Amino acid sequence: MRVAFIYRWLLCGAAIVNVLVAQRHTASDNPSTYNIGGVLSNSDSEEHFRTTIAHLNFDQQYVPRKVTYYDKTIRMDKNPIKTVFNVCDKLIEKRVYAVVVSHEQTSGDLSPAAVSYTSGFYSIPVIGISSRDAAFSDKNIHVSFLRTVPPYYHQADVWLEMLSHFLYTKVIIIHSSDTDGRAILGRFQTTSQTYYDDVDVRATVELIVEFEPKLESFTEHLIDMKTAQSRVYLMYASTEDAQVIFRDAGEYNMTGEGHVWIVTEQALHANNTPDGVLGLQLEHAHSDKGHIRDSVYVLASAIKEMISNETIAEAPKDCGDSAVNWESGKRLFQYLKSRNITGETGQVAFDDNGDRIYAGYDVINIREHQKQHVVGKFSYDSPRGKMRMRINDSEIIWGGKQKRKPEGIMIPTHLKLLTIEEKPFVYVRRMGDDEFRCEPDERPCPLFNASGATANEFCCRGYCIDLLIELSKRINFTYDLALSPDGQFGHYILRNNSGAMTLRKEWTGLIGELVNERADMIVAPLTINPERAEYIEFSKPFKYQGITILEKKPSRSSTLVSFLQPFSNTLWILVMVSVHVVALVLYLLDRFSPFGRFKLSHSDSNEEKALNLSSAVWFAWGVLLNSGIGEGTPRSFSARVLGMVWAGFAMIIVASYTANLAAFLVLERPKTKLSGINDARLRNTMENLTCATVKGSSVDMYFRRQVELSNMYRTMESNNYVTAEQAIQDVKKGKLMAFIWDSSRLEYEASKDCELVTAGELFGRSGYGIGLQKGSPWTDAVTLAILEFHESGFMEKLDKQWIFHGHVQQNCELFEKTPNTLGLKNMAGVFILVGVGIAGGVGLIIIEVIYKKHQVKKQKRLDIARHAADKWRGTIEKRKTIRASLAMQRQYNVGLMATHAPGTISLAVDKRRYPRLGQRLGPERAWPGDGADVLRIRRPYDLGKGGLTASQLGLGKTRPQQNPLPPRYSPGYTSDVSHLVV
């Protein structure tokens, strides 16, 4: 560890020694004396230059040890050629490292240019202290020139600050067609692009007036200026040209009240400058001594830093050597441009062109008798590190000797207005061929095509038209009203026309017409949002609103089976199953219960039959449907207990069904399907749910900038409509489930059609405002008028008249509050059920009749067969009887003959052959009215015995016999029956 520590210290020591050796070597390689050249305009400047360098050598802050500066000066010659020779012979041959140059303002700029050309050829830096022409900013020509004074065109920066201070938004620029005039215009346009990113009020150039120097008349340009809207004039002109411009402007009364002139330094010195003109004056502009000192110290500061960083080669010595390329001079020029010191003329710094920045200006106000009065300053603010404008507005005397700041713009009284069809705010009606004017409550609103020709004549009326009529009366303006050319409110399109890295927004529709100054005002339901407010002005909202959702009310759908809705399908199935299960259990309980059958007291009759299955099913259905039960009731106690429980179950089921049926068929339908924008079905849109808005509208922009709605917007983007009217029609038809749009329009549609309803609460709250151009003079007047309309109740009157439709809304509410009654549509299923029952009964009776006919035919065939068989059997028996009788007769005859005694023939019943013949009284089948148990018929021989009647014998009702067949008899002899003696 100790060895490593010592090794590190040795490395650090070696590095420090190397740095010190390098610095000593560099310092020893650099020159110790530096000659500074001066091309000055007078002896005082030359003397001050020498004195400044002498004092510099004793200032250790700027001069390193063993370094000495020497001055080499020459007098500026008006002849540029002589100046070139003097520079070569008296400065470059003396090895000057830089040149400070000044000249008289009246001598022109040719001599300083000659010094710049000559020195620049050898890369010798030149510091100008009085040259302010724009040409010196061109580094392709003046490669090594920089200056401690700003060029004239830098006054454009001060213009922007003044416009921002006075809140002027529209200007006219007047400039000469020379290099400086075009430079100040370019500077203004370029700087304004970045300057207005930090301020709220943006100034635009309405008109650019370019004139040739050495004017004789400016009248032609003044005519164009007078028709413009702006009354703020920014002028760059020479003193001579400014005199001509002021002379002609005075003749056209364009220098008096309401006109604002802001001019540069040269124009400020015209001998006819009007009262109220504002101009700029560079601080220390004529202080050559201050600029000489600042230039010398800037040079010393750059050389000192350069000495500490690199080796400086000696300056060139011979002008005749064209091959000299002094790289140290180029490097020294870069060091000079990076200087930033506090000098006698203020903060001294340079831009990339070597031009002075942070130069201070006085704001001059011209008063009576051409007196100049300082009313403000544009100076460097050290704490903030930038320039700051300070103007005392109360000290300014404006044109026409006014103390109040002019509006800076001519307020036109005839405006071009645009609107768009959007019910109920604007109704549009095409004029008929035989119509020449609109109705009293309408206003003409033609539709212009791209070429500007009238395509169609329309009439407009509605909420916004009534507002426009009242507004024009209140603030006193006339107007021409037209419809939006493309029928859209407008949205922006990102374009890159010039190939720049940044995209530019281009607006379409109504907004595009306003941005491109093809219209003065938009009177329509125009939603105020940040995207639009960046490019146009808005009045205070004339109606506050938000975004909501329009949908169709759920219909009172009544299907044929609507009477089954009180119970679910599962419950209906369970009820059906329960009926038959209970019937089966009743049958089993009554069948197997020992008490399920009973006997009559003191009776020897047979037992009654138990409850059969069909009777049990009939009983279960009868109890459930609350129908009378005439027969087939349970006999056993256990079955009757179950029957009572089943009756209670049936009562609960029927009561529940009745209550729920009323709820389903009579109660109000739900008003909406959606709960609002936070409904999960909207946030996670399903295939069977469609929602949409209007393409490029303010609602569309709202969804774009809301991150939490991005998923929903991606889904609905493909469904968006071109117009709101199309979307509303699709909602009515059921093609679109939810239309998201401005609440005012949707509330109007819902009040007009009772089948439509708005869902949920408002979101994205904003307002409708009147759109105007940026900086429009009508903005404040329109805003104040709208506020007065709100206070007076005029806006509320328009709401009731056009949006809410009081009578229609009342009818809808009455319709909603009316108790719902059941109609055929609701109970059609019940009637169909009855019809099915009737049809089923008819079908069953037909089946029964057909079956009975078939049975009767079959029974007849059986009876005929039985009768034939009986007849045949009787015939056979008769033949047998006859044969037997004949045989007996023969035997009898034989016996008689044998015994000669009388004989008899027996006709008694043959009991052995027909043992049950005496019991037949008819078929043993029950007759209607018989008891539940049919008793067997007793023998008729018991009747009359001992005085017993049929009812006492237990016969009950006796069946009358029809044509009873006589018993068959066979002849024969018997000992216990009567016989017939023949």
Curated annotation (Swiss-Prot):
Membrane disposition: Multi-pass membrane protein
A GO molecular function held by the record: glutamate-gated receptor activity
Record's subcellular location: Cell membrane; Postsynaptic cell membrane; Postsynaptic density
Organismal lineage: Eukaryota, Metazoa, Ecdysozoa, Arthropoda, Hexapoda
Gene Ontology cellular-component annotations: NMDA selective glutamate receptor complex; postsynaptic density; postsynaptic membrane
Domain of life of the organism encoding this protein: Eukaryota
Official protein name in the record: Glutamate [NMDA] receptor subunit 1
Pfam families tied to this protein: ANF_receptor (PF01094), CaM_bdg_C0 (PF10562), Lig_chan (PF00060), Lig_chan-Glu_bd (PF10613)
Alphabetical list of InterPro entries matching this protein: ANF_lig-bd_rcpt (IPR001828), CaM-bd_C0_NMDA_rcpt_NR1 (IPR018882), Glu/Gly-bd (IPR019594), Iono_Glu_rcpt_met (IPR001508), Ionotropic_Glu_rcpt (IPR015683), Iontro_rcpt_C (IPR001320), NMDA1-like_ligand-bd (IPR049872), NMDA1-like_N (IPR049873)
One of the GO BP terms on file: olfactory learning
Binding locations of glycine: P525, L526, T527, R532, S698, D742
Gene3D superfamilies associated with the record: 1.10.287.70, 3.40.50.2300, Periplasmic binding protein-like II
Known role: NMDA receptor subtype of glutamate-gated ion channels with high calcium permeability and voltage-dependent sensitivity to magnesium. Mediated by glycine. This protein plays a key role in synaptic plasticity, synaptogenesis, excitotoxicity, memory acquisition and learning. It mediates neuronal functions in glutamate neurotransmission. Is involved in the cell surface targeting of NMDA receptors. Plays a role in associative learning and in long-term memory consolidation.
Gene from which the chain derives: Nmdar1
